């Protein structure tokens, strides 16, 4: 056809029948990928330990999205919360995956049908007989249908009126479960961590979409506006669609990275800011002080800390610790966590309680420094032993564990104390199995990090795509040298189509 590879999509510019065919095929590919990816993830997923080896530690990407929408059970007899399941019903993880694959096949067949039967009366202007699309009307139809879907999701699925609800948890990711959510119409609905805002915003946006769709179906655009915005050009649709997609991608990159009610930490892992701000450390400290006020011993107080909460307070679960070129799930890095050793409390020979300075997010190595409650450095692991003043040996540091597997155990051997001081830099201390997956000890990012990176990157690329196609449609006459108001048929390439009587045939 004489088109370079990067311009082959122009063959559907003035061909509504095949334009719908390629969009159907694209939807088939997206749906097929989602279903296939879900089945792959379910095949490699180990649901046996939802506390220390949750889905986000195993690198699952599409399963968390299914879970937040209300899917929690598997035909394999397990549920995401750890219970055994006898009857998962149709809408299990595998059921949803199978539905996507079946839908993909139907879209594939529809794409083939529309590719073959491209010359439909539906796409011909009865006045001129030429292929055409009433783009403003199509815009109204899409707006109306998406509004209905948006409203239905907020009013029925999220609220539990006709659906399971969504995943809701507490700020510390301990009590998460699928439950109905009532809409919140006050100012608190704008808080990104309030689940009720998800219901109310979908209801409000859906109503707006329905009204806007009806408006665009019943009111024609003014001729000046129609021409100014090139509403008759399909590339205008492409440009504005790309704008909607890149804007959405930027928004979800932000809600994922910074956290929100729609991206719960039980499904996607903690955010880096929870480590930076000592979010879980502060909650653990509050619980310990509360227990101590009830006259519990340190050992009893630490034994009451949920293992799940302690595990969040570990730098290996920070999505910013994994490099972009370190492929694989978190478990491939520091291994599969198998147990919490307990909280390490360091003391010098004078009886001062010492706190190990924690490693900041963006450091790979960090000096081991132990300070007292007032921030005065009292011990360290020196770089140059000859000049050391505060070495573990000189200061006589000991370590004792409270809670966890080493509850009540203490060590005074300097080598052992140093080992645990180094590990305490990384938060709470966990024992990991590195043998099973041949884990290399190098931190990986969680699905939260990968989602953010992917969506921010593609949003940037799509932003440039919007500028490019917007410029092409607004200044088409300048780029092509053709008057946009010209009535003459302009042929950019030779169209070769099944059943097209105008297609040139080679003379045999």
From Swiss-Prot:
Localization (cell): Plastid, Chloroplast thylakoid membrane
UniProt-listed SUPFAM superfamilies: Photosystem II antenna protein-like
Transmembrane portions of the chain: 21-36, 101-115, 140-156, 203-218, 237-252, 457-472
InterPro entries linked: PS_antenna-like, PS_II_antenna-like_sf, PSII_PsbB
Subunit structure: PSII is composed of 1 copy each of membrane proteins PsbA, PsbB, PsbC, PsbD, PsbE, PsbF, PsbH, PsbI, PsbJ, PsbK, PsbL, PsbM, PsbT, PsbX, PsbY, PsbZ, Psb30/Ycf12, at least 3 peripheral proteins of the oxygen-evolving complex and a large number of cofactors. It forms dimeric complexes.
Family: Belongs to the PsbB/PsbC family. PsbB subfamily.
Protein name per Swiss-Prot or TrEMBL: Photosystem II CP47 reaction center protein
Lineage: Eukaryota, Viridiplantae, Streptophyta, Embryophyta, Tracheophyta
